Amino acid sequence: MSHPNQNPTTGTAYLVGAGPGDPDLLTVKARRLLDEADVVLHDNLVGDDLVASIPECTTVENVGKRPGGERTPQAEINDMLVREARAGRDVVRLKGGDPTLFGRGGEEAEHLARHGVPFEFVPGVTSAIAGPSAGGIPATHRDHASALAVVTGHEDPTKPDSAIDWEALADIVSAGGTLVVLMGVGRLPDNVAALDERGVAEETPVAMVERATLPSERTVTGTLDTIVERARAAEIEPPAVTVVGEVVNVRETVANCLGGAAGETGPAVGLGPVEEEIEVNQR
């Protein structure tokens, strides 16, 4: 049934997941929509190679947000989607990972619905799963983890009205589950402290996978007690995925036979007396 505000000539908005970075991990449907779209509005996390593959006749605009840098306000992005669709154009809103996992796809969908614009979610491979697996770390494992929690690491865990229940997350990790933190590089010390203060053992394995699935991918491993220092020594930068839990140890078992960036080991990053303890894997 059509929306009462919907114009018969209105285009369709597609909220599309671009996957974790490697263009080969783009879904077949996403590829088709990019080839057929009139307009593509993409985020910064969408790789340059993927953007370059969009047909030249398509209007392409970067509406991404950089931490601490320039950004297109979300309200403006919402209005752009409505404006382009009402002009009769099919528009792809291209987001890194999956559009509904910390991608604000739900907010955009609500805005489109309020304005009578037909839309569709097109799922993508989320970095919450692809990031760890690219680094040789399964999100779950029959012998190690039967529970998985995924949270944003961008929120300040010390604020009194935090929407994240760090006590519950600590319980999951302590019980053998896996915690995946997205967008958590800047707040890594705070997030580690939040888990430590709630009883997670210092020796709990932790890994950070930077730019997962891309040629520049790097993986740093450590424990809750050492990961902040190791990540700092390796100069890990966004985008990176943090994995906490016993599944991180699987990497040590499989790394020698793992293909892709995670299977190729680069030089150690020195940090004085702990140089021997730091492993950075890089393609």
Annotate each PLM feature.
Residues 3, 96-175, 218-221:
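Class I SAM-dependent methyltransferase SAM-binding "motif I" and its flanking Rossmann-like core
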Residues 58-65, 119-120, 139-149, 199-208:
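Short hydrophobic/aromatic-enriched beta-strand-loop microsegments
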